Amino acid sequence: MAKRGKKYVEAAKLVDRAAAYSATEAVELVKKTNTAKFDATVEAAFRLGVDPKKADQQIRGAVVLPHGTGKVQRVLVFAKGEKAKEAEAAGADFVGDADYIGKIQQGWFDFDVVVATPDMMGEVGKLGRVLGPKGLMPNPKTGTVTFDVTKAVNEIKAGKVEYRVDKAGNIHVPIGKVSFEDAKLVENFRTIADTLQKVKPAAAKGTYMKNVTVASTMGPGVRVDVSTLA
Protein backbone atom coordinates (compact mmCIF):
# COMPACT_ATOMS: atom_id res chain seq x y z
CA MET A 1 0.00 0.00 0.00
CA ALA A 2 1.32 3.44 -0.95
CA LYS A 3 2.52 5.60 1.90
CA ARG A 4 0.19 8.50 2.63
CA GLY A 5 1.56 12.05 2.52
CA LYS A 6 1.80 14.26 5.61
CA LYS A 7 -1.11 16.46 4.48
CA TYR A 8 -3.35 13.42 4.01
CA VAL A 9 -2.45 12.04 7.44
CA GLU A 10 -3.24 15.38 9.09
CA ALA A 11 -6.52 15.67 7.19
CA ALA A 12 -7.53 12.12 8.12
CA LYS A 13 -7.22 13.01 11.82
CA LEU A 14 -10.24 15.31 11.40
CA VAL A 15 -12.43 12.35 10.47
CA ASP A 16 -13.84 10.06 13.16
CA ARG A 17 -13.68 6.69 11.39
CA ALA A 18 -16.16 5.17 13.84
CA ALA A 19 -18.79 7.84 13.14
CA ALA A 20 -21.44 8.10 10.44
CA TYR A 21 -21.95 11.76 9.61
CA SER A 22 -25.04 13.45 8.19
CA ALA A 23 -24.84 14.24 4.49
CA THR A 24 -24.33 17.93 5.27
CA GLU A 25 -21.62 17.29 7.89
CA ALA A 26 -19.88 14.84 5.55
CA VAL A 27 -19.73 17.36 2.72
CA GLU A 28 -18.32 20.00 5.08
CA LEU A 29 -15.65 17.52 6.24
CA VAL A 30 -14.74 16.57 2.69
CA LYS A 31 -14.00 20.21 1.96
CA LYS A 32 -11.95 20.61 5.16
CA THR A 33 -9.92 17.49 4.43
CA ASN A 34 -9.28 18.19 0.75
CA THR A 35 -5.50 18.36 0.25
CA ALA A 36 -5.41 18.91 -3.52
CA LYS A 37 -4.21 22.21 -4.92
CA PHE A 38 -6.72 21.95 -7.78
CA ASP A 39 -10.53 21.98 -7.78
CA ALA A 40 -10.87 18.33 -6.78
CA THR A 41 -13.79 16.12 -7.68
CA VAL A 42 -16.06 14.97 -4.86
CA GLU A 43 -17.04 11.32 -5.26
CA ALA A 44 -19.67 9.26 -3.48
CA ALA A 45 -19.18 5.52 -2.99
CA PHE A 46 -22.08 3.16 -2.27
CA ARG A 47 -21.56 -0.43 -1.07
CA LEU A 48 -24.75 -2.27 -1.94
CA GLY A 49 -26.23 -5.52 -0.72
CA VAL A 50 -26.44 -7.09 -4.17
CA ASP A 51 -24.77 -10.02 -5.92
CA PRO A 52 -23.55 -8.60 -9.26
CA LYS A 53 -22.85 -12.13 -10.51
CA LYS A 54 -26.60 -12.65 -10.79
CA ALA A 55 -28.29 -11.14 -13.84
CA ASP A 56 -31.30 -9.97 -11.83
CA GLN A 57 -29.08 -7.97 -9.45
CA GLN A 58 -27.14 -5.96 -12.02
CA ILE A 59 -27.48 -2.20 -11.53
CA ARG A 60 -26.71 0.18 -14.35
CA GLY A 61 -28.18 3.46 -15.48
CA ALA A 62 -27.78 7.22 -15.59
CA VAL A 63 -29.17 10.26 -13.80
CA VAL A 64 -29.00 14.00 -14.40
CA LEU A 65 -27.58 15.71 -11.30
CA PRO A 66 -29.43 18.97 -10.52
CA HIS A 67 -26.18 20.92 -10.29
CA GLY A 68 -24.02 18.93 -12.70
CA THR A 69 -20.55 17.59 -11.91
CA GLY A 70 -18.49 20.69 -12.63
CA LYS A 71 -16.82 18.90 -15.51
CA VAL A 72 -17.38 19.88 -19.14
CA GLN A 73 -18.15 16.63 -20.95
CA ARG A 74 -16.89 16.18 -24.51
CA VAL A 75 -19.56 14.29 -26.43
CA LEU A 76 -19.00 12.15 -29.52
CA VAL A 77 -22.14 11.21 -31.46
CA PHE A 78 -22.28 8.50 -34.11
CA ALA A 79 -25.13 9.48 -36.43
CA LYS A 80 -25.98 10.12 -40.09
CA GLY A 81 -28.11 12.58 -42.05
CA GLU A 82 -30.70 14.55 -40.10
CA LYS A 83 -29.70 12.94 -36.80
CA ALA A 84 -26.13 14.12 -37.31
CA LYS A 85 -27.42 17.67 -37.90
CA GLU A 86 -29.56 17.43 -34.73
CA ALA A 87 -26.53 16.32 -32.70
CA GLU A 88 -24.46 19.23 -33.99
CA ALA A 89 -27.27 21.69 -33.22
CA ALA A 90 -27.55 20.27 -29.68
CA GLY A 91 -23.89 21.03 -29.01
CA ALA A 92 -22.15 17.69 -29.55
CA ASP A 93 -18.38 18.18 -29.76
CA PHE A 94 -17.84 15.56 -32.45
CA VAL A 95 -20.37 14.08 -34.90
CA GLY A 96 -19.66 11.50 -37.57
CA ASP A 97 -19.76 7.86 -38.59
CA ALA A 98 -17.09 5.60 -40.10
CA ASP A 99 -14.40 8.30 -40.03
CA TYR A 100 -14.44 8.45 -36.22
CA ILE A 101 -14.47 4.66 -35.94
CA GLY A 102 -11.15 4.62 -37.79
CA LYS A 103 -9.71 7.39 -35.61
CA ILE A 104 -10.63 5.54 -32.40
CA GLN A 105 -9.11 2.31 -33.70
CA GLN A 106 -5.90 4.29 -34.18
CA GLY A 107 -5.92 5.49 -30.58
CA TRP A 108 -7.93 8.74 -30.55
CA PHE A 109 -9.84 9.32 -27.30
CA ASP A 110 -10.43 13.08 -26.99
CA PHE A 111 -13.99 12.58 -25.71
CA ASP A 112 -15.74 11.65 -22.46
CA VAL A 113 -19.10 10.21 -23.55
CA VAL A 114 -20.23 8.37 -26.69
CA VAL A 115 -23.78 8.48 -28.05
CA ALA A 116 -24.97 6.45 -31.04
CA THR A 117 -28.22 6.14 -32.96
CA PRO A 118 -29.47 2.51 -33.07
CA ASP A 119 -28.80 2.23 -36.82
CA MET A 120 -25.12 2.99 -36.17
CA MET A 121 -24.59 0.27 -33.56
CA GLY A 122 -23.66 -2.34 -36.16
CA GLU A 123 -20.61 -0.22 -36.99
CA VAL A 124 -19.96 1.09 -33.47
CA GLY A 125 -20.04 -2.51 -32.21
CA LYS A 126 -16.65 -2.99 -33.88
CA LEU A 127 -15.24 -0.72 -31.16
CA GLY A 128 -16.51 -2.90 -28.30
CA ARG A 129 -13.07 -4.18 -27.31
CA VAL A 130 -11.69 -0.65 -27.29
CA LEU A 131 -14.55 1.34 -25.75
CA GLY A 132 -15.90 -1.36 -23.43
CA PRO A 133 -12.96 -1.53 -20.98
CA LYS A 134 -12.97 2.28 -20.74
CA GLY A 135 -16.70 2.38 -19.92
CA LEU A 136 -17.37 4.36 -23.10
CA MET A 137 -19.50 1.90 -25.08
CA PRO A 138 -22.98 3.31 -25.84
CA ASN A 139 -25.77 1.46 -24.03
CA PRO A 140 -29.59 1.75 -24.12
CA LYS A 141 -29.70 1.50 -20.28
CA THR A 142 -27.78 4.75 -19.93
CA GLY A 143 -29.66 6.52 -22.71
CA THR A 144 -26.65 6.64 -25.01
CA VAL A 145 -28.15 4.44 -27.74
CA THR A 146 -31.06 6.52 -28.98
CA PHE A 147 -32.56 8.35 -31.94
CA ASP A 148 -33.32 11.28 -29.63
CA VAL A 149 -29.79 12.64 -29.90
CA THR A 150 -30.87 16.15 -28.91
CA LYS A 151 -32.13 14.94 -25.52
CA ALA A 152 -29.07 12.72 -25.01
CA VAL A 153 -26.58 15.52 -25.70
CA ASN A 154 -28.54 18.07 -23.66
CA GLU A 155 -28.68 15.75 -20.62
CA ILE A 156 -24.99 14.93 -20.79
CA LYS A 157 -24.06 18.60 -21.06
CA ALA A 158 -26.43 19.37 -18.15
CA GLY A 159 -24.60 16.96 -15.84
CA LYS A 160 -25.81 13.42 -16.47
CA VAL A 161 -23.69 10.77 -14.78
CA GLU A 162 -23.66 7.04 -15.37
CA TYR A 163 -23.58 4.50 -12.56
CA ARG A 164 -22.76 0.80 -12.67
CA VAL A 165 -22.23 -1.73 -9.92
CA ASP A 166 -18.78 -3.36 -9.95
CA LYS A 167 -17.93 -6.99 -9.17
CA ALA A 168 -17.71 -6.21 -5.44
CA GLY A 169 -21.14 -4.55 -5.28
CA ASN A 170 -19.82 -0.97 -5.22
CA ILE A 171 -20.92 2.08 -7.19
CA HIS A 172 -18.73 5.20 -7.49
CA VAL A 173 -20.28 8.43 -8.75
CA PRO A 174 -18.91 12.00 -8.98
CA ILE A 175 -21.25 14.50 -7.30
CA GLY A 176 -19.42 17.75 -8.03
CA LYS A 177 -16.30 19.73 -7.16
CA VAL A 178 -14.99 20.99 -3.81
CA SER A 179 -15.69 24.52 -5.07
CA PHE A 180 -19.45 23.77 -5.13
CA GLU A 181 -21.68 25.22 -2.42
CA ASP A 182 -22.37 22.66 0.32
CA ALA A 183 -26.10 22.64 -0.43
CA LYS A 184 -25.51 21.84 -4.10
CA LEU A 185 -23.21 18.93 -3.29
CA VAL A 186 -25.75 17.57 -0.81
CA GLU A 187 -28.58 17.85 -3.34
CA ASN A 188 -26.53 16.03 -5.99
CA PHE A 189 -25.61 13.40 -3.37
CA ARG A 190 -29.27 12.86 -2.42
CA THR A 191 -30.30 12.68 -6.06
CA ILE A 192 -27.98 9.76 -6.79
CA ALA A 193 -28.89 8.03 -3.50
CA ASP A 194 -32.61 8.37 -4.30
CA THR A 195 -32.02 7.03 -7.81
CA LEU A 196 -30.17 3.97 -6.48
CA GLN A 197 -33.02 3.29 -4.04
CA LYS A 198 -35.51 3.38 -6.93
CA VAL A 199 -33.54 0.84 -8.98
CA LYS A 200 -33.06 -1.61 -6.09
CA PRO A 201 -33.35 -5.12 -7.57
CA ALA A 202 -36.36 -7.07 -6.30
CA ALA A 203 -34.05 -10.05 -5.76
CA ALA A 204 -31.73 -8.14 -3.41
CA LYS A 205 -32.00 -9.47 0.16
CA GLY A 206 -31.08 -7.91 3.50
CA THR A 207 -29.68 -4.41 3.90
CA TYR A 208 -29.48 -2.69 0.52
CA MET A 209 -27.28 0.35 1.22
CA LYS A 210 -24.65 -1.24 3.44
CA ASN A 211 -22.18 1.62 3.50
CA VAL A 212 -21.89 5.07 1.94
CA THR A 213 -18.80 7.26 1.94
CA VAL A 214 -17.85 10.52 0.29
CA ALA A 215 -14.37 11.90 -0.42
CA SER A 216 -12.47 14.38 -2.54
CA THR A 217 -9.95 13.18 -5.13
CA MET A 218 -6.99 13.12 -2.71
CA GLY A 219 -8.80 13.27 0.62
CA PRO A 220 -9.89 10.65 3.18
CA GLY A 221 -13.27 8.94 2.98
CA VAL A 222 -16.06 10.18 5.24
CA ARG A 223 -18.77 7.68 6.21
CA VAL A 224 -22.34 8.92 5.80
CA ASP A 225 -25.49 8.10 7.77
CA VAL A 226 -27.72 6.67 5.02
CA SER A 227 -30.91 7.97 6.68
CA THR A 228 -29.75 11.57 6.07
CA LEU A 229 -29.72 10.97 2.32
CA ALA A 230 -33.47 10.42 2.16
Swiss-Prot record:
InterPro entries associated with the record: Ribosom_uL1_bac-type (IPR005878), Ribosomal_uL1 (IPR002143), Ribosomal_uL1-like (IPR023674), Ribosomal_uL1/biogenesis (IPR028364), Ribosomal_uL1_3-a/b-sand (IPR016095), Ribosomal_uL1_CS (IPR023673)
One Gene Ontology cellular component: large ribosomal subunit
One GO BP: translation
Cross-referenced NCBIfam families: rplA_bact
Matches recorded under PANTHER family: 54S RIBOSOMAL PROTEIN L1, MITOCHONDRIAL, LARGE RIBOSOMAL SUBUNIT PROTEIN UL1M
Family, as annotated: Belongs to the universal ribosomal protein uL1 family.
Protein name per Swiss-Prot or TrEMBL: Large ribosomal subunit protein uL1
Organism of provenance: Bacillus anthracis
Gene expressing this chain: rplA
